[in-house]
C-alpha cells in the first residue's frame, strides 16, 4: 500500500484548529525563507498504546493506534548542498543547518537536529537502494502538537515525517507503507533509543478508529 496524498484537511476530525496550524507553518516558513516556495507538506501522527508498553522490542505483541496529534512540515526542495530545519516553536527548537555530506550525529550536541539526522541516515540508505545517490537540498519548517515526553511517540512522529519528506524530495513517489515502516523502525537507534517498531508502525499504518495488533 502506497503512502497517500491529500487535497484538503478533511482527514482531521476537527479541521479548524489544524487549519490554523498549517497557516502558522506557512507563515513561519515564509518568514524563515522569504522568496522560497513550499513544494509540499509532510505529516506523521503520534500514537497511543493500549496494551503492551515497552515489550515490542522483546518481540511481544502490542496494541497501539494512531492519534490525531501529529507532526507536520512545510518542505522546500532545492539544489543546495544542505538541509535547513526550523520550527514554529523557535525558542525550544532552534534553526539548524545540516550538510548533506555529513549526517554524522554528534552525541555531545543535544539537539532536535540529531533526530532529523536519524531520518536522513535511513532515508539515504533507502534512496541508494532505489538508485538515488545525489540528494537534494531542503528547507523545512516543522510544527508538532504531540506532547514531548508524553508517551505518545513525538520523536517517532518527527522521524517518520522527516524520512517521508526526504524521500519525497528526492523524487520517490511510490514509497510503500511497508518500506517506510521498515526503514524508520531503526532510525532512532542512531541516537541510542531502543525501539522495537511499534511507534513507527502505528504512525505509518494507523487508520481512523482502528487498533493495530503488532
From Swiss-Prot:
GO molecular function, one term: galactokinase activity
Pfam families: GalKase_gal_bdg (PF10509), GHMP_kinases_N (PF00288)
InterPro entries found in the cross-reference section: Galactokinase, Galactokinase_CS, GalKase_N, GHMP_kinase_N_dom, GHMP_knse_ATP-bd_CS, Ribosomal_Su5_D2-typ_SF, Ribsml_uS5_D2-typ_fold_subgr
Gene Ontology CC entries for this record: cytosol
Annotated site (Transition state stabilizer): 47
A GO biological-process term: galactose metabolic process
Claim: ATP-binding is one of the keywords in the record: yes
Family: Belongs to the GHMP kinase family. GalK subfamily.
Protein name: Galactokinase
Amino acid at each position: 500500500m502506497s503512502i497517500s496524498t491529500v487535497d484538503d484537511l478533511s482527514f482531521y476530525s476537527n479541521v479548524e484548529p489544524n487549519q490554523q496550524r498549517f497557516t502558522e507553518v506557512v507563515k513561519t516558513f515564509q518568514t524563515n525563507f522569504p522568496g522560497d516556495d513550499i513544494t509540499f507538506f509532510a505529516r506523521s501522527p503520534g500514537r497511543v498504546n493500549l496494551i503492551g508498553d515497552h515489550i515490542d522490542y522483546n518481540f511481544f505483541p502490542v496494541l497501539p493506534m494512531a492519534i490525531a496529534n501529529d507532526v507536520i512540515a512545510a518542505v522546500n526542495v532545492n539544489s543546495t548542498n544542505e538541509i535547513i530545519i526550523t520550527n514554529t516553536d523557535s525558542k525550544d527548537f532552534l534553526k539548524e543547518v545540516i550538510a548533506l555530506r555529513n549526517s554524522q550525529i554528534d552525541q555531545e550536541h543535544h539537539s532536535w537536529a540529531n533526530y532529523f539526522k536519524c531520518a536522513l541516515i535511513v532515508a539515504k540508505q533507502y534512496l541508494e537502494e532505489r538508485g538515488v545517490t545525489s540528494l537534494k537540498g531542503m528547507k523545512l519548517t516543522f510544527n508538532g502538537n504531540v506532547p514531548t515526553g508524553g508517551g505518545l511517540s513525538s520523536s517517532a512522529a518527527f522521524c517518520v515525517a522527516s524520512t517521508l519528506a526526504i524521500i519525497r524530495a528526492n523524487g520517490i513517489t511510490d514509497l510503500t507503507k511497508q518500506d517506510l515502516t521498515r526503514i524508520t523502525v531503526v532510525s532512532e537507534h542512531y541516537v541510542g533509543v531502543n525501539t522495537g517498531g511499534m511507534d513507527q508502525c502505528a504512525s505509518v499504518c494507523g487508520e481512523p478508529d482502528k487498533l493495530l495488533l503488532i
